Amino acid sequence: MHDPGRAAYTGPMTRNTRTIPANVSPEAAALLERAYAIDSDATSRALYRDWAETYDATMLDGLRYRSPALVAALLGEHLPDRTAQVLDVGCGTGLAGQSLAELGFELIDGMDISPEMMQVAARRGVYRHFIAADLNQPLDMPDAHYDGAACSGTFTHGHVDARCLDELFRILRPGAPFAFTVKREVWEPLGFKDALQRLMAEGRITESAFRLDRHYDSSEQPDGVFCVYRRT
């Protein structure tokens, strides 16, 4: 069995290791630090309530954020049917959904904890439905509901740990790919390596793609794990 942690993890990392890309504005760095410091659902909701209207400018202009487009492209490579029902997990303001729509996907649902972020995402006109959900809790959704899923910017410091993976794969149909990225610094500390290995050992998922890449153009080295796993 392939060990995803072998390529991704090269030395000791802790929950307190938080890398801010170089050469970004002080405003962008401050917001990213605030995001990394989230310690509860309440602080998460408060941050994204305050950040919703300026998030895109901060991430695209201030940080030169590339993860949403990369994750969308990964899903597009592994899900050729553009009429498939796709879930954008932690959709935020819809950056990944916009990229999915540009690739031709027609049936995209967005899921997020922040109503303010989803209100911004709705303006893009690319989503079919929105689902308010806390990924740290069981999802009120039927089994085998989606043909594929994408997730960018959610599996990072202070947001959601690997316990959500069981639920996310549960709502995917057999054979459905899930393309996502995990902040490299939390790959092991927040349990993603172990959870994925367990799910593979149980025969519930298979690995389709795995690589290291940069979340931001301003990053000096790969700071994210980008991968695709399929529900069996």
Regions found by a protein language model. Give the residues of each.
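Core SAM-dependent methyltransferase catalytic element
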Residues: 216-232
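Class I SAM-dependent methyltransferase SAM/SAH-binding core
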Residues: 87-138
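Conserved beta-strand signature within the Rossmann-like core of class I S-adenosyl-L-methionine
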Residues: 175-183
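Conserved Class I S-adenosyl-L-methionine
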Residues: 190-211
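A short glycine-rich, Lys/Arg-flanked "PGG" loop and its adjoining helix->strand segment in the class I
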Residues: 163-174
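Conserved alpha-helix/loop element of class I SAM-dependent methyltransferases that forms part
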Residues: 65-82
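N-terminal auxiliary segments of SAM/dcSAM-dependent transferases
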Residues: 2, 6, 10-41
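A short acidic, Gly/Pro-enriched loop at the edge of an enzyme's catalytic core
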Residues: 139-149
